[in-house]
Amino acid sequence: MTTPRLEAPGVVLRPLEAADAEALFAAHGDATTHTYWSSPAHTSVEQTRTYIAETIAIPGALAWAITESGGEALGRIALFVQREGVGEIGIIMRPEATGRGLASKALNAVVAHAFGPLDLHRIAADIDPDNTSSISLFLRAGFQREGTLRGNWKTHIGIRDSVMMARLRD
């Protein structure tokens, strides 16, 4: 599956590439930003570069750099299509890029692509229950909270539950 360039007012999503590692280390290397990920914050740009390469290589993965005009990556959003008609979205933003509506615009653009050209019927998200900003982001994008999976992840901050959220095609 080829990751296309997506554009919406105020945001350009371009295919994620290894060269984005330095810019995205600001997100993946930040302990606060990375709190609710399954792994601890990255300790080097090289670790972020490896993570990007591994993400891009996942079968069914579409991964984008979130930008304002196609330039430097301010965040990363990925859609993983691992079975027919169903995808899962993950997103991370650099700390200085939060609060500007970029994550919301990026999420809405990927949802439109998933339900349009990709013809998915369901998109899910797996979110730590303490990650209230991410839960709010997905609620604003029309996702519904479906339930909680108790003890779903063994992470660097302990065994964590997952809030399962999803949106169905209208």
Where are these regions (language model features)?
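Acyl-donor (CoA/ACP) binding surface of acyl/acetyltransferases
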Residues: 1-31, 63-170
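Conserved GNAT-fold acetyl-CoA-binding loop/helix
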Residues: 32-54
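Short linear sequence elements within intrinsically disordered, low-complexity coil regions
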Residues: 41-42, 56, 120, 148
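Short loop/turn motifs at secondary-structure junctions and domain boundaries
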Residues: 55-60, 143
